Amino acid sequence: RPNPNTHYIDGPVLNLKHQSFVGMHPVPIVYGMTIGEYAKMINGEGWLKGGIRCKLDIIPIQNYTHNTAYKLPIRPSPNLPNAQAVALYPSLCLLEPTVVSVGRGTNQQFQIYGHPSFTKYQFSFTPQPNFGSKNPKHKGEVCYGKDLTQIEKPKRIELQWLLDAYSNFPDKDTFFLKGFERISGVSNLKKQLIKGTPEPEIRKSWSEELNKFKRLRSKYLIYP
């Protein structure tokens, strides 16, 4: 099937010491491949347990390229209600293991973010239990922040929202929750945020591993 986020490749490449159910292989957050292409890579690189290789049958998608716009016919998760949420998820997922709400407990999940302390912002929302989140972060509290529902579909991971949230949160020592390295896939992003590393330097620190991945990826592509 198509992948709605194959139009770019970005993010730190997973360090296997942070391997988990949410990140199993040494790929970036956005790897720019269909599930068939990704399966070819897993097989070809021997990433299955014990290095085994499976018999793989892939039915190619007709008239598809990595830049083909694709809107999922149904929501892939209760907390990814529409195409905008799917597009913003790779960027906003980095706020999940922090004190900041990404809209769980609203009907705009992964399209907004905020915290009760961000009172300089006019936009606000109040998370409440719903089908996708029985006990959302900051339940019943007014959160102030940013509304991203109308912004253009990103062409890279947007670090600006993570940097903005960290900069505006008053108690830096309590900003990160357990599992930030598991979501980001690396140890240094958290350290860079704490240090105040500028965004261009953060991106530069990804570049070598990201370029290696792009070369590896090219071996397994089915679509232009």
Task: List each language-model region with its residue ranges.
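Glycine-rich, charge-decorated loop segments at or immediately adjacent to ligand/cofactor-binding or catalytic sites
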Residues: P2-L16
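Conserved functional hotspot residues or short segments at active or partner-binding sites
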Residues: Q108-S207
